[in-house]
Amino acid sequence: MTDYKDTLNLPQTDFPMRANLPEREPQTLARWQTLDLYRKIRKDREGQPKFILHDGPPYANGRAHLGTAFNKTLKDIVVKSKTLSGFDAPFVPGWDCHGLPIELNVEKKLGKDKLSANAFRQACRDYAFSQIELQRDDFQRLGVLGDWQHPYLTMDFGYEADTVRALAKIVANGHLLRGQKPVHWCAACGSALAEAEVEYRDKASPAVDVGFEAVDAEAVRQRFGVKNATTRVLVPIWTTTPWTLPANEAVSVHPELHYALVKSELQNQPVYLILAKDLVDSAMLRYGVDDYEVHGNLKGDALEGMQLQHPFLDRIVPIILGEHVTTEAGTGNVHTAPAHGLEDYFVAEKYNLPINNPVDARGRFIPDTFLVGGQPVFKANEPIIVLLADSGHLLHSETIQHSYPHCWRHKTPLIFRATPQWFIGMNKNGLRERALAEIEKVTWLPAWGEARIGKLVADRPDWCISRQRLWGIPIPLFIHKKSGELHPKSPALMEKVAQLIEKESVDAWFDLDPKVLLGDDADHYEKVTDVLDVWFDSGVTHFCVLEKRRELKVPADIYLEGSDQHRGWFQSSLLTSLAIRDKAPYKSVLTYGFVVDSQGRKMSKSLGNVILPADVVKNLGADVLRLWAASMDYTVEVNVSDEILKRASDAYRRIRNTARFLLSNLYDFDPKKDKVAVDQLVALDRWAIFTTQKLQEKIITAYDRYRFPAIYQAIHNFCTVEMGSFYLDIIKDRLYTSKESGLPRRSAQTALYYIAEAFVRWIAPIISFTADEIWQFMPGDREPSVFLTQWFSDFPNAALSGEEEQRWQLLLQIRDEVNKALETYRNEGKIGSALTAEVVLYADERLNAVIATLGEELRFVLITSEASVLPFNEKSKAAFDTALPGLALEINVSEFEKCARCWQRRSSVGQIKEHADLCDRCVSNAFEDGEMRQFA
């Protein structure tokens, strides 16, 4: 038998079948660096409309984890897609460099006491730099394009100086407050914590009911209309923090709630209790009392001013009115310790009550505190409860599990503790109202983000921006020693400090002799040594980065971070921006869910479910990780596991194989001279171009709307359905067996060329390494990288009418039914390959009209040796119905010989003497002018 291999146009390409991403991707990275790709993109897009995605700075501590890898990948997808849309979309990465975790690491390594303050700060700076280098390598290895040589760092001298300038503007605009307010305090940190640094965890706490005895019981009884009685009156409070009782200054009741005077017997003694009417039954049940009488009924405002005896201190405390009192639990009477609770503080402020804070920075009672001096606060619960029981003031005690604030770093319970701090006042100059109004102008993705941040801003307290740490940006203020007022020239003085910091770092402030700035006034002023909350550092990036860097702009088009940043960066950025320039720093905000395992659990070493991005990159490649990121619905929790990553790897393989097929059939195609005009295209090729163009519109829209899973699904379906199992499958025969330069083959190659040009760009934002690798093998003259181009727009006008579209959709369904039937016959051993079969289609009028248009070329669409169509009502006994209404099939084994070249079984095989083992079509294609195709 003659070997006809040389007469075939078999696929050939140097584009490797095996991706080998872990080895190949670093080579692509090196090429990008040699090319200086990021700078080239910037130059290429100069003068185009700007699109700014502003990078929220990750913390400079530790290698990139899967959450940060997911974050940077999504951002990179957005930036690259906007670049392909023609925007100038620079990406300036940043890092958050101050704060406690870095201090703790340096402390552990070097010890704090062994170093001077300046040396300690330098050690923190060095440590942060080392962590930035690690993370920068991790992010670049993921294929993230950005200005990695010039990132913004919150510890850069210039950034630190600009942060001081941002604070100066906030001071000048009247938003800064000073006060001794209760703040979340971590004893392990020895510092206040921001709202965003607080985690809520379950904690076991004692829940106690404590009786405060009325000083003038008779007057109280008379208020309730009870006369001629001598029984004492108790006002029970319910609390889960008995340790705060030494700081009690009042008992709060709600002015509008109804309160009852309840007569009962407790501890074998008659007693009157004042309880919220709605809580009488639950309280008496708790006290184990069945027999009680309700005497009188008063609204809370009638109790205001009543005096009570503190249960164990020589202190008289008043009943005051508070709107925060509820009937959800307890007694309706709220223990009020202004030093240990915000609501307590605010209500006490109205009554000018003292802020009595007996707890030091280590979370211990100061030595002269009665009973519990020197003890840690939580250990003080027990002796206080024992004392209350011994004195008869303990009405009930139990242990409950409840959600309680913990330190995000130490995982230890926090306390509320009043300390002198600096605040951005939420209600000063209408900041809260303006923030809520501005939130409504921003586009929130998903939409529920608006309600979430709105509620957080509506409910949040003043923002405590001061910390008592060494490693941070100073709050460079001078306070008058007698009046406590800020120096009248504070903004101007802060500018002078900023200029010093710009040259010498934050040490310039800590080392500064006040006389240098204040002269003779220095003796009257105290220098503030607090540093700024790190959320302030990162919250002013809009001022220090977006406003200062020439290539950026404010407001940014989008901020993109995890949903926890509604409490953190989104909020701190919004508040500082409003306090500085009275508008939001962003036009839109996109949030995503936490990365969890396949069972929805957080990544944890103890659970053994931690997956490191470095390991994924090492084993599967960055493009597989990127494809996983794009495929996930980020609006909910994002699942990851080895199995999920394997699925991403399989999907990647399908995309790569599709690209390889396209490239391997374009090896001899020169788009300048081989492209076929649209009016000469084979109908199937025209359909493929039209389908590609139509899908591109959907994909670009999905990129614009940040619908990455929809893009992933569209590309995956394109590779597996429209292309893989339909178009590419059908045209193999034409590509391989038609005349090399004949119209049928060039028509198919023209379609493949357009598909490849579009396809490589679709995947570029997601699997960037692979897209740029494909780009190097594409035919024709082109830019050195796919990222120096835009979405493909050079499609011919291959538009189909609605009727033509519908016809091809029906053909897809018909072919699917034929394929299923052939597969069944193959599994049953009735046929070998599909080319051994002859198919008769029995079709109703609707389907017949579609099938008949293909004429003799129907067999090429079905990839069978013969195919014919007959009316549905002429079904033979051998025919069987399909799932498609109006279509039945009959499958027979062809009785003809197989063509040695195209493998189809045709009656013409053996009829041509010179080429007895070929069909007439192959003789024409190999040795004559070649066949013609009209439809397929």
Swiss-Prot record:
User: Sorted alphabetically, which Pfam families does this protein's record hold?
Assistant: Anticodon_1, tRNA-synt_1, zf-FPG_IleRS
- List, alphabetically, the Gene3D superfamilies matched: 1.10.730.20, HUPs, Valyl/Leucyl/Isoleucyl-tRNA synthetase, editing domain
- Cofactor list: Zn(2+)
Cofactor binding notes: Binds 1 zinc ion per subunit.
Q: Does the keyword Flavoprotein apply?
A: no
According to the UniProt record, what class of enzyme is this? ligase
State the reactions this protein catalyses. tRNA(Ile) + L-isoleucine + ATP = L-isoleucyl-tRNA(Ile) + AMP + diphosphate
Q: Binding positions for ATP?
A: K605
Motif, 'HIGH' region: chain positions = 58-68
Q: What is its main location?
A: cytoplasm
Q: Name one GO biological process term.
A: isoleucyl-tRNA aminoacylation
Q: Which GO terms describe its molecular function?
A: aminoacyl-tRNA deacylase activity; ATP binding; isoleucine-tRNA ligase activity; tRNA binding; zinc ion binding
| Sites where the protein binds Zn(2+) | C899, C902, C919, C922
For this protein, what is the EC number? 6.1.1.5
Alphabetically ordered keywords of this record = Aminoacyl-tRNA synthetase, ATP-binding, Cytoplasm, Ligase, Metal-binding, Nucleotide-binding, Protein biosynthesis, Zinc
Motif 'KMSKS' region is found at 602-606
Q: Where in the cell is it found?
A: Cytoplasm
What's written under domain? IleRS has two distinct active sites: one for aminoacylation and one for editing. The misactivated valine is translocated from the active site to the editing site, which sterically excludes the correctly activated isoleucine. The single editing site contains two valyl binding pockets, one specific for each substrate (Val-AMP or Val-tRNA(Ile)).
Q: Subunit structure, briefly?
A: Monomer.
Query: What protein family does this chain belong to?
Result: Belongs to the class-I aminoacyl-tRNA synthetase family. IleS type 1 subfamily.
Mind telling me what this protein is named?
Isoleucine--tRNA ligase
What is the native source organism of this protein?
Coxiella burnetii (strain RSA 331 / Henzerling II)
Where is the organism placed in the taxonomic lineage, from the top? Bacteria, Pseudomonadati, Pseudomonadota, Gammaproteobacteria, Legionellales
The protein's gene is named ileS
